[in-house]
Amino acid sequence: MFKASLENNNLPELGAVTVEFPIPEDRYEETIRALEKIKIGTTLDKDCCVADLRSTDCPALRRMINRMANVDELDWLAKQLESLDRYELLQFNAAAERFGLSSVGEMMDLSFCSREVTVISDFNDLENVGRRHHLTLLVTGTPEEQGPLVGTETAQRLIAGQPGHVTQYGVVYDNGMKLKQAYDGKHLPQSWWAENCLMELEIGAQGETDKKKFEWVQLPTSQIKLERAMLRAGISSCGEMQLLFSGSRFSDEVDCALDFEYESLFELNHLCQACAEFQDADFEKLGAVCQMAKPVCAASIRQLAENLDQFDFAPDAHTPEELGKYMIQRSRRYEYDEKLKDFYNYDDYGVKKLLQEDGTFVDRGYISYRGTLTLEELMRDDPAESCQQEQEAKMEGMAW
């Protein structure tokens, strides 16, 4: 999305750090450490001076040059802008110039409402302009009262009906848009659901009821990013945190097994890290495994996820015959011959498999376990490791 050179405004002799935004997840901690070397990049302060900025898709962001920003604000803005299509980026660029915005907070606020303006960059194509304008009004909830959509006539009504403001990106028509504060300067708003996100939560200090003081977190992520989110939310330790579930890519069986009133944020993150490479079939299989094993916490589910290859799953098989049919036709363990389909005894094979295995039918199909440990032993987490993780999550005296 963009690259920015960030420097310490008070100590420019320390040099600048060039950061790619949004910051790749595997380089986030490295980036924070690099900023710390020039004594910027703290969690709560706007201590990064934007010395330079380059963006092909969003040149209006250069208006932030020489302004102060927080590194996580810049990262949030980049993620938000990545979700915009080509015309939406044009709207954002033009609106930023139209309203004279230059601070990162103003840009963050604009990202929520820039879709409400209409931008005409080509007056030779009024048909397309009219269609765009009509769709824009649908976004604002104020569509024109008209019959069948006629693009050119709609564009002509727009041009004649309200003043346009010339920018380098085109002529901007406000459509009554008002810039409203969505960011309070501390608590980052909810952002676009990232492609790699498996679970989204809100975290707040114990007893806090003002939802504006909660932080949104998307898992999996780095531990340092979680710790910074805790600081923004005023959470000093894991024991003083409340978790609110927003959504996940996991199956209902997994979500229902988690008691978010008592879960550890870091254990949930470890679970999501363990499932980061899962495909849809893996999530479905894990749901079936959870129905069979009945885990009661994120740590147990993580153990199941990490040992998913010790389970066999026949999706949608709910009878011995369906199980036998799946194994012979779809499991790839046998060379199935379509010409002999009437000669296979699926029911007998399914019954035989049931008698030989430690398996059961669940809502999603048939699931069996072939590991050497009992399920209780498999799900048992290392108590010493859990204790160490909780100690590492203490926030007192943290530098960031």
Q: What role is predicted for each listed range?
A:
Residues 1-43, 195-235:
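N-terminal ordered "arm"
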Residues 28-102, 224-296:
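Structured domain cores in non-transmembrane regions
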Residues 103, 116, 290-304, 310-311:
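Elongated scaffolding segments in large macromolecular assemblies
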Residues 112-122, 135:
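Extended, low-hydrophobicity segments enriched in charged/polar residues
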Residues 124-210, 214, 321, 325-373:
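Extended, well-ordered protein cores
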Residues 150, 345, 385-400:
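Non-Sec secretion/translocation targeting segments of pathogen effectors
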Residues 374-390:
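Eukaryotic nuclear/nucleolar intrinsically disordered, charge-dense low-complexity regions
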